[in-house]
């Protein structure tokens, strides 16, 4: 029944002609059969693993390709968008003419083919969600977006009209990129007037997920709704926490907590009703995953989950420790693969705790500090972490990075707009902010997940607010001297060095980087006033 109706779906309005068949919102069973067909070759082919989930290889792109991201500069966007020539971001402008050329490459590639169409929602709040239609010729890409977007009911599909269309032409590249003045033959491009995203040359699934996040980041703050690169969960008493952080800092791991219900692991909005998830699934890193350390995520890897770039041995077992292909090995799964989730809709009330996760490769920042409102704005705009190996193409060593709002790669408006909306929402809810370092200290080792979980527990149950504190110089951060279940010797990062002078010189180096980065926000009075909330030399 479903398939017969689907054949009638008219795709000519998107420039797609001669389409031989359309599989609209196929079942997981159908997708499994399609993506494991023995005649598939190359990156189209999925392989079965002993855990029951299919594994795929995304080729040379094992992460997003920020250098190949473009947005059409036209009357809609020219004055509102945060362009790459105005700040550190990936919003490179292209003309409508270049867009037309790129789009015709994709429509030519997808025309005359058998296509998968997935209709889904981005956003759990019906008032503000985007209806997204994804069109691809690759079965596992359809599986990926079925996992990651919110799955409509049969009734919701009846009258589904897309607000945004994503056409994934991963098999096609742009031979004229030099003439167009672009970075390479690959492209991920957006047109906010047409409300279309097109993809060429990269097979990485995350481009579709993060593409729609970037669009929500444009549309929601203009309505006064916070749009956030964060995970979120809720306790038994309805107490909501959000966890901001860049890739690899612990958003998914730390918000997946047996004692709390998961709202979502990566993208959320905050409106008058509270926190809501944008997504219908999770996209967890699997490098060095173990059943003991992360049972919820490990147990989510079963039939209907989709693994990316992991090493599958000849006996179908998975070597999660092998990062030879990439450190950015991942799994996508529908959110209900985690038992402990908010049901039936991934949303909850207002957040009381806002946690900024950072993975400090320098070994300077404390494992936890409570932030003042001014420090909250300062650290939100700074968005410091260390880029971890392989989450983007071309990065293999931990290197310091500053990413406004802990997600500059996905921001489409000026960072101060996100800071303003967030702080307004926090003040209205009486929320408090903390910075948590999940990175390294003077021992040269990463802070243990057990200690970090103990810190998070202390924040969530309020015991951190009763703890005695002391001040960490240079960064002027208040840190607890002891917390239940946490190794007290790590709470002051200076104590982890055999020679405390080492910390001093590293702290000075990192402070200078913070100051240099924050200079970009001092072009107005509010930005100038926030300098005092940052490190002082």
From Swiss-Prot:
Biochemical pathway: Carbohydrate biosynthesis; gluconeogenesis
Compartments in which it is found: Cytoplasm
Matches recorded under PROSITE patterns: PEPCK_ATP
Cofactor or coenzyme needed: Mn(2+)
Reactions mediated catalytically: oxaloacetate + ATP = phosphoenolpyruvate + ADP + CO2
E.C. number: 4.1.1.49
GO cellular component: cytosol
Entry keyword set: ATP-binding, Cytoplasm, Decarboxylase, Gluconeogenesis, Lyase, Manganese, Metal-binding, Nucleotide-binding
SUPFAM superfamilies according to UniProt: PEP carboxykinase N-terminal domain (SSF68923), PEP carboxykinase-like (SSF53795)
Function: Involved in the gluconeogenesis. Catalyzes the conversion of oxaloacetate (OAA) to phosphoenolpyruvate (PEP) through direct phosphoryl transfer between the nucleoside triphosphate and OAA.
Subunit structure, as described in the record: Monomer.
Descriptive protein name: Phosphoenolpyruvate carboxykinase (ATP)
Gene: pckA
């Amino acid at each position: 029944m479903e398939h017969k109706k689907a054949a009638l779906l008219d795709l000519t309005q998107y420039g797609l002609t001669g389409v031989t068949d359309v599989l609209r919102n196929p079942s997981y069973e159908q997708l499994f059969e399609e993506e494991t067909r023995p005649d598939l070759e190359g990156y189209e082919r999925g392989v079965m693993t002993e855990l029951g989930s299919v594994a795929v290889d995304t080729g040379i792109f094992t992460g997003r390709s920020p250098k190949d991201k473009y947005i059409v500069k036209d009357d809609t966007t020219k004055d509102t968008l945060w362009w790459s020539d105005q700040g550190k971001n990936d919003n490179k402008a292209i003309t409508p003419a270049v867009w037309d050329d790129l789009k015709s490459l994709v429509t030519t590639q997808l025309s005359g083919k058998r296509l998968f169409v997935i209709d889904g929602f981005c956003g759990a709040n019906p008032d503000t969600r985007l209806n997204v239609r994804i069109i691809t010729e690759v079965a596992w890409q359809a599986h990926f977006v079925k996992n990651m977007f919110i799955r409509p009911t049969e009734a919701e599909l009846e009258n589904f009209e897309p607000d945004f269309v994503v056409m994934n032409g991963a098999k096609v590249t742009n031979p004229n990129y030099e003439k167009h003045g672009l970075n390479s033959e690959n492209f991920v491009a957006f047109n906010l007037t047409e409300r279309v995203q097109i993809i060429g040359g990269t097979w990485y699934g995350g481009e579709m997920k993060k593409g729609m996040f970037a669009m929500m980041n444009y549309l929601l703050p203009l309505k006064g709704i916070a749009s956030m690169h964060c995970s979120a969960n809720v306790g038994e008493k309805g107490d909501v926490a959000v966890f901001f952080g860049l890739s690899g800092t612990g958003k998914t791991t730390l918000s997946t907590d047996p004692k709390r219900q998961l709202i979502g692991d990566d993208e959320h909005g905050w409106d008058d009703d509270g926190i809501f998830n944008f997504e219908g699934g999770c996209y967890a890193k699997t490098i060095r995953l173990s059943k003991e350390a992360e049972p919820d995520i490990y147990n989510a890897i079963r039939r209907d989950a989709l693994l990316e770039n992991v090493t599958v041995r000849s006996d179908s077992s998975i070597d999660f420790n092998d990062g030879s292909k990439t450190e950015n090995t991942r799994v996508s799964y529908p959110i209900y693969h985690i038992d402990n989730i908010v049901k039936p809709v991934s949303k909850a009330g207002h957040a009381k705790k806002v946690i900024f996760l950072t993975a400090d490769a320098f070994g300077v920042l404390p494992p936890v500090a409570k932030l003042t409102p001014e420090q909250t704005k300062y650290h939100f705009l700074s968005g410091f972490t260390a880029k971890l190996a392989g989450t983007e193409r071309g990065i293999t060593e931990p290197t310091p990075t500053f990413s406004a709002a802990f997600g500059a790669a996905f921001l489409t408006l000026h960072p101060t707009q996100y800071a303003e909306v967030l702080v307004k929402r926090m003040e209205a809810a009486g929320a408090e902010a903390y910075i948590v370092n999940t990175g390294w200290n003077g021992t040269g080792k990463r802070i243990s997940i057990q200690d970090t979980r103990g810190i998070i527990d202390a924040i969530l149950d309020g015991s951190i607010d009763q703890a005695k504190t002391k001040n960490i110089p240079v960064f002027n951060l208040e840190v607890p001297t002891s917390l239940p279940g946490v190794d007290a010797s790590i709470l002051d990062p200076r104590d982890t060095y055999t020679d405390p002078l080492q910390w001093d010189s590293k702290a000075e180096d990192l402070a200078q980087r913070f100051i240099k980065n924050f200079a970009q926000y001092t072009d107005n009075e509010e930005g100038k006033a926030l300098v005092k909330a940052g490190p002082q030399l």
